[in-house]
A protein has these predicted regions:
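Single conserved hydrophobic/aromatic residue that forms the stacking wall/gate
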Residues: 1-11
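Active-site-proximal cap/loop segments of hydrolase catalytic domains
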Residues: 9, 14-201
Length: 201
C-alpha cells in the first residue's frame, strides 16, 4: 500500500480521550480534514527537562517520527509540523535541529527568549518574565544568571541551520505572544535567504 504523509501537531501534553470535533479550530490543524486526506496525525506528549524546553520537544518527537517511518506508516519525504504559541516555539526550535520536515507552520512563536523575557502582555500589562523563569518555558533562571540557557533555547540564534520552508502566522493584536517575535523570525529568515512567509491574521 501507498504510504501516508505525516503531520505533527506540537504543543505540550495531550490526552488520548480528547475527541476533536470536525470543525475549524482557531490555531490548530483540523485533524479530520487531514486524516481524511491520508495524513497520519502525530500528537506527541512532551516530557520536559527544566532548562531545556526545545531539546525536550526534539527528544520526544523525533523517536516517534523515526519509528513511524521505519514501520512504513509515513513517507519520510512528506512530513510536516505545525504548532501555535508554545507549539509555534517548539516547531521553530525543531527547524533548527532537523531537516526532516518538508514544511513547517509556526503560529505565534517566540524565537528570541531574551527579548520576549523583557516584554509585557499587552492586555494586562503583566511582565512576561515569569513564564520564562518558572512556568511554560521552564528555563528556571533569569537571563542574567543563565544567559547560555536563554541563548540555547532561542531559535533565532541558530536559524542559519534551517533548511525547511516555514510559514509564520502571527497577529499584531496578540496579547500573549509579542508580535515582534514573528517579525524577528521573518526578518532573520529572509536575511539568511531561507524560504519563509509571514501572515498577519
Amino acid at each position: 500500500p501507498e504510504m501516508s504523509r505525516g503531520l505533527g501537531d506540537v504543543y505540550k501534553r495531550q490526552t488520548l480521550y480528547n475527541y476533536r470535533m470536525p470543525e475549524p479550530h482557531r490555531s490548530t490543524i483540523d485533524y479530520h480534514l487531514y486524516n481524511s486526506n491520508e495524513y497520519v496525525i502525530f500528537n506527541p506528549d512532551i516530557r520536559y527537562v527544566d532548562g531545556y524546553p526545545g531539546e525536550s520537544c526534539y527528544n520526544c518527537l523525533m523517536p516517534g517520527i523515526t519509528m513511524m517511518i521505519a514501520k512504513g506508516y509515513i513517507d519520510e519525504k512528506g512530513i510536516g509540523a505545525q504548532g501555535h504559541s508554545w507549539g509555534g516555539y517548539q516547531v521553530a526550535y525543531l527547524a533548527t535541529r532537523t531537516n526532516l520536515f518538508s514544511a513547517i507552520e509556526s503560529g505565534a512563536p517566540v524565537v528570541n527568549m531574551f527579548s520576549a523575557y523583557g516584554g509585557i502582555r499587552w492586555g494586562s500589562g503583566m511582565a512576561r518574565s515569569f513564564q520564562y523563569e518558572h512556568t511554560q518555558s521552564r528555563l528556571g533562571a533569569t537571563p542574567w544568571s543563565s544567559p547560555l540557557r536563554y541563548l540555547e533555547n532561542s531559535p533565532l540564534f541558530t536559524m542559519d541551520k534551517v533548511q525547511t520552508p516555514i510559514l509564520i502566522m502571527h497577529n499584531d493584536a496578540d496579547g500573549h505572544v509579542p508580535w515582534y517575535q514573528g517579525i524577528e523570525y521573518f526578518v532573520a529568515m529572509k536575511r539568511l535567504g531561507k524560504p519563509c512567509w509571514l501572515l498577519n491574521y
